[in-house]
Amino acid sequence: MEKAAKKEAVESLNGLFKTTSVAVVAHYSGLTVAQMQKLRSQMKLAGASVKVSKNRLAKIALEGTDVVAIGSLLKGPTVIATSNDPVAAPKVAVEFAKANEKFVILGGSMGTTVLNVDGVKALASLPSLDELRAKLVGLLVAPATKIAQLTTAPASKLARVVQAYASKDEAA
């Protein structure tokens, strides 16, 4: 890799690390190309990205970012998964690690907080931002629905009583 290409790679990685809220570091040694493609596509569907680069270049790119602490995890063949949603990258990485034993999660970072393997797994178990929004909307809509049911209930009960009385008169 030429010096200009290295500089461009470092700048690209640095921009990615500055804009990301969470990063997950894992070893990928022994994975096939098809498995790596599957990981990339799953990450892309979740709104996350996967980067494989030289560890030395990644460590340089980490300088001046919130996730600088993950530099100590960059040893051996590593992959870095990043996302703006704090749950997306960890969730996909943990699910992929369960299916592929050669994909080993080393740790990660959320903002300036360094996460060990258990921290990444705990983050992955949380609901995503979209799921939380859906639950919040459900909680906000539920009282309005109940109020609407309560206000229409007396009228419908009265209508049923009148209907029953009318059918009783017709039968007699």
UniProtKB/Swiss-Prot annotation:
Pfam families documented for this protein: Ribosomal_L10
Keyword Translocase: no
GO cellular component, one term: large ribosomal subunit
UniProt signal peptide: none
SUPFAM superfamilies according to UniProt: Ribosomal protein L10-like
Keywords for the protein's UniProt record, in alphabetical order: Ribonucleoprotein, Ribosomal protein, RNA-binding, rRNA-binding
HAMAP family recorded: Ribosomal_uL10 (MF_00362)
Family to which this protein belongs: Belongs to the universal ribosomal protein uL10 family.
Assembly information from the UniProt record: Part of the ribosomal stalk of the 50S ribosomal subunit. The N-terminus interacts with L11 and the large rRNA to form the base of the stalk. The C-terminus forms an elongated spine to which L12 dimers bind in a sequential fashion forming a multimeric L10(L12)X complex.
Official protein name in the record: Large ribosomal subunit protein uL10
